[in-house]
Amino acid sequence: MNIRRTIIGVSLGVAMAVPAAAQEFGTDADASYAADLWATMEDGRLVGANALYGFPYEGIDPHGALLETFYTKATVGGHTGTLIVKRNYGPVEIDQVIGNPTEHLAAITVMFRREAGYDADNQDWFWVKYLPDGSLDKNPKGVSLAGRVAKGADVGCIACHSGDPDYVFTSDASFD
């Protein structure tokens, strides 16, 4: 009887652990970190009501018809890392975005290089997709797009960006 309880207990433990291991993004911890990152970006005027603007350039799916990309360093939770902020607009003309960027902003996609060991398989990048108001976008299953987004999947942030040696298509700059 003890053996049966042990087998049932182990089986339930494994069954409960598999779904948890399968989801490597969108956790409460990811959402909290994304909120801290948003606050840091607001302070740096990269997002929010006082954001600075650049000149948009032509983009491609999944990001948008027009984009603005900013590269900098930021400190979140005591760690300083490379921060890449991409504002996704469209489908509109450049003059429309320049004339009223907030009206045409669809999303803000961000890569932040976290501390060594966060996700060594993918160069320690933290991925997040915000809606214009700073809330987290969600995938069709309702999972927040923050953290190791779509790690191990055939499509998604990591799958696409792993096609470039440093995961950054828009620049050949060093991000160490």
Give the positions of each predicted feature.
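Bacterial N-terminal signal peptides that target proteins for export
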Residues: M1-I8
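Sparse, context-dependent recognition of short Cys/His-centered cofactor- or disulfide-binding micro-motifs
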Residues: I7, T69, D95
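Bacterial N-terminal signal peptides
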Residues: G9-A17
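Signals and flexible motifs at protein termini associated with secretion
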Residues: M16-E24
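Sequence context surrounding c-type heme c attachment/ligation sites in exported
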Residues: Q23-G26, D30-A34, T75-D176
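N-terminal secretory signal peptides
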Residues: Q23-K86
